Amino acid sequence: MRLLFPFFFIIFMFQSFSFSQEWIIKNKWKISCGLVNKEALVINGKPKKTYSKNEFKVDGAIFKLNKGDVGKCKSDKKPTGGYKYSGRQEITHKLLPGKNIFEAEILTAGAPQYRSHFFQIHDGRSKGKPPSMVSVNKDWMIRNQHSIDCFKPNCKQLSYDAYLKPGERKNFKAEVEYKNKEKKISAKYYLDNELIIQHLNVPLDTKKTDGPYGPNRPYIKIGMYRIGDTGTTTFSYNKIVLKNKR
């Protein structure tokens, strides 16, 4: 029996290690800041009519903003980028240490805007750009933005021929590695399997941050955060998958 114990122990350790290397689906989202109105957010085909801080599962989400809709975050009422206010409807998910993959089919519709962020890695900072952001401009071209702590070649746009034009379904993927001990994130973004943006080894702000998951806890944001609205716009995210591997 004593001879068998080391054998079973080795098998147990191998299985535990193998399990730790497997991708695990994560699906605990919640509303960011609040609801603009009863039509601004649709989750899994059902409108979110009341604001709650509770978490929920998401397979598909539709974000809709009309001209003049102001977001519910405190900063949204303040002028920014030459515009009087920001429009916003977003949901968030905690970013876990290790490797993360977010995937979704994105479909836009409606009027253009000067700029609209549709994916962010945020660290809860109250001022300045967060570590990693992906947006569309008024011509629907995808552009990268990031904090001032990252420079080329670590942070750069690799393709200037990537668009989210209304009526065109696109497969978007984000590969994000969160190094908890180093307090850094690395992100690579793909559109229809083409690498279009990279933000590598971007430091997180560790001074005074206060996000929805507590101080110094980074998170993912998807949806619409825009300035320079010209009309009603929707961003639809279908087949949403978020998975993590430690």
Question: Whereabouts are the PLM-identified features?
Answer:
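Boundary at the C-terminal end of the N-terminal hydrophobic targeting segment
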Residues: 18-20
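Secretory/extracellular carbohydrate-interaction modules
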Residues: 58-143
